[in-house]
């Protein structure tokens, strides 16, 4: 099967990391990028040099208004209106919508006017169907023009919750994500009318915040709808986050039995998305890890056989971006079979 031709709208953190991941993904070829706020020369610089993930492993050039990556031309556009991006002329059948702006079905559908066939939103969506790899992607039937890859935190939590719920049954649970700061936060204390705490200096504070990850898990695993709720703690690290899932389980099990169930899933049906480690890791050890969820066997605890705290790491940039491409490849295969 020839590589799937893909366009990226929005060349921010996720857009660029999706691009870097695509170089390693044999089923995907990025043929076009659109970003109205970046000129081509600067896009090449931003792709080449990354303070978190290092220097791009390959050749990047600029030819006219286009990028040339490892000898292949990537068209570069600066359209503000998604409907005006000429995806068709680039051959891009699928578009990764990573601006964080066009996250509803109606807004993201504008890409179809430019010739795209399907749009994958790299963020949660209020109304587009959400899919998480190894959790519910098999329910995709090809009918939706716009879908969502959910959030990075949902992609970490959902595989872990699936294993625990399938094996032991989750009665109820609380999830906290200890999350690296992101571009929406402030480098110095500044105005943030809708989120006063969020306006405080990102690199100086631990900031309580909200997240919709648990609610989204209820959408991709309907049996858990209403059983989980969550919060976030934004912390002064640039990348890598960690999920703390505290749950009451129906079928009693020792912590060792729970660890074994997760290990078997990570080495079996969930391999490549869920990982398992007994090493004494810290957050920077997870930079560039392509898994969505890396269960830390030594970090968890249990109070008794029905009450347990589970800890799982995730590179909220790299691992999430890899899943965007995996979902895209899955969607393309389903579409091709129709």
Swiss-Prot record:
<dbReference type="GO" id="GO:0050661">
    <property type="term" value="F:NADP binding"/>
</dbReference>
<feature type="binding site">
    <location>
        <position position="182"/>
    </location>
    <ligand>
        <name>D-glyceraldehyde 3-phosphate</name>
    </ligand>
</feature>
<dbReference type="InterPro" id="IPR020830">
    <property type="entry name" value="GlycerAld_3-P_DH_AS"/>
</dbReference>
<dbReference type="GO" id="GO:0006096">
    <property type="term" value="P:glycolytic process"/>
</dbReference>
<feature type="binding site">
    <location>
        <position position="80"/>
    </location>
    <ligand>
        <name>NAD(+)</name>
    </ligand>
</feature>
<dbReference type="Pfam" id="PF00044">
    <property type="entry name" value="Gp_dh_N"/>
</dbReference>
<dbReference type="InterPro" id="IPR020828">
    <property type="entry name" value="GlycerAld_3-P_DH_NAD(P)-bd"/>
</dbReference>
<dbReference type="InterPro" id="IPR020831">
    <property type="entry name" value="GlycerAld/Erythrose_P_DH"/>
</dbReference>
<feature type="active site" description="Nucleophile">
    <location>
        <position position="152"/>
    </location>
</feature>
<keyword id="KW-0963">Cytoplasm</keyword>
<dbReference type="GO" id="GO:0006006">
    <property type="term" value="P:glucose metabolic process"/>
</dbReference>
<feature type="binding site">
    <location>
        <position position="316"/>
    </location>
    <ligand>
        <name>NAD(+)</name>
    </ligand>
</feature>
<comment type="similarity">
    <text>Belongs to the glyceraldehyde-3-phosphate dehydrogenase family.</text>
</comment>
<feature type="binding site">
    <location>
        <begin position="13"/>
        <end position="14"/>
    </location>
    <ligand>
        <name>NAD(+)</name>
    </ligand>
</feature>
<keyword id="KW-0520">NAD</keyword>
<keyword id="KW-0324">Glycolysis</keyword>
<dbReference type="GO" id="GO:0004365">
    <property type="term" value="F:glyceraldehyde-3-phosphate dehydrogenase (NAD+) (phosphorylating) activity"/>
</dbReference>
<comment type="subunit">
    <text>Homotetramer.</text>
</comment>
<feature type="binding site">
    <location>
        <begin position="151"/>
        <end position="153"/>
    </location>
    <ligand>
        <name>D-glyceraldehyde 3-phosphate</name>
    </ligand>
</feature>
<protein>
    <recommendedName>
        <fullName>Glyceraldehyde-3-phosphate dehydrogenase</fullName>
        <ecNumber>1.2.1.12</ecNumber>
    </recommendedName>
</protein>
<dbReference type="GO" id="GO:0005829">
    <property type="term" value="C:cytosol"/>
</dbReference>
<dbReference type="InterPro" id="IPR020829">
    <property type="entry name" value="GlycerAld_3-P_DH_cat"/>
</dbReference>
<feature type="binding site">
    <location>
        <position position="35"/>
    </location>
    <ligand>
        <name>NAD(+)</name>
    </ligand>
</feature>
<dbReference type="InterPro" id="IPR006424">
    <property type="entry name" value="Glyceraldehyde-3-P_DH_1"/>
</dbReference>
<comment type="pathway">
    <text>Carbohydrate degradation; glycolysis; pyruvate from D-glyceraldehyde 3-phosphate: step 1/5.</text>
</comment>
<feature type="site" description="Activates thiol group during catalysis">
    <location>
        <position position="179"/>
    </location>
</feature>
<keyword id="KW-0560">Oxidoreductase</keyword>
<dbReference type="InterPro" id="IPR036291">
    <property type="entry name" value="NAD(P)-bd_dom_sf"/>
</dbReference>
<dbReference type="Pfam" id="PF02800">
    <property type="entry name" value="Gp_dh_C"/>
</dbReference>
<feature type="binding site">
    <location>
        <begin position="211"/>
        <end position="212"/>
    </location>
    <ligand>
        <name>D-glyceraldehyde 3-phosphate</name>
    </ligand>
</feature>
<feature type="binding site">
    <location>
        <position position="234"/>
    </location>
    <ligand>
        <name>D-glyceraldehyde 3-phosphate</name>
    </ligand>
</feature>
<dbReference type="GO" id="GO:0051287">
    <property type="term" value="F:NAD binding"/>
</dbReference>
């Amino acid at each position: 099967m020839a590589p799937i031709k893909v366009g990226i709208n929005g060349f921010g953190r996720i857009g660029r990391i999706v691009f870097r991941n695509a170089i390693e993904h044999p089923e995907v070829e990025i043929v076009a990028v659109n970003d109205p706020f970046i000129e081509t020369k600067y896009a090449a610089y931003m792709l080449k040099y990354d303070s978190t993930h290092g220097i791009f492993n390959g050749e990047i050039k600029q030819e006219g208004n286009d990028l040339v990556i490892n000898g292949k031309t990537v068209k570069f556009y600066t359209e503000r209106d998604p409907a005006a991006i000429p995806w068709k002329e680039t051959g891009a059948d699928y578009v990764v919508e990573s601006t964080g702006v066009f996250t509803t079905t109606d807004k993201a559908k504008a890409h179809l006017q430019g010739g795209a066939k399907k749009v994958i939103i790299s963020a949660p969506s209020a109304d587009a169907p959400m899919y998480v790899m190894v959790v519910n992607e098999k329910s995709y039937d090809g009918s939706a023009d716009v879908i969502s890859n959910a959030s990075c935190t949902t992609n970490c939590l959902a595989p872990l919750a699936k294993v625990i719920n399938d094996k032991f049954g989750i009665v109820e649970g609380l999830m906290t994500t200890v999350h690296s700061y992101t571009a929406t936060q402030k480098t110095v204390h500044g105005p943030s009318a809708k989120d006063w705490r969020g306006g405080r200096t990102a690199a100086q504070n631990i900031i309580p915040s909200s997240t919709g990850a648990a609610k989204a898990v209820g959408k991709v695993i309907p049996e858990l709808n209403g059983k989980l709720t969550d919060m976030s703690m934004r912390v002064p690290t640039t990348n890598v986050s960690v999920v703390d899932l505290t749950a009451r389980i129906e079928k009693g099990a020792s912590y060792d039995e729970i660890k074994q169930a997760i290990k078997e899933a990570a080495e079996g049906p969930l391999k490549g998305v869920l990982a398992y480690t007994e090493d004494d890791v810290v957050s920077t050890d997870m930079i560039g890890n392509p898994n969505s969820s890396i269960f830390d066997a030594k970090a968890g605890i249990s109070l008794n056989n029905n009450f347990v705290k589970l800890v799982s790491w995730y590179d909220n940039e790299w691992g999430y971006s890899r899943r965007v491409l995996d979902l895209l490849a899955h969607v393309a295969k389903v579409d091709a079979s129709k």
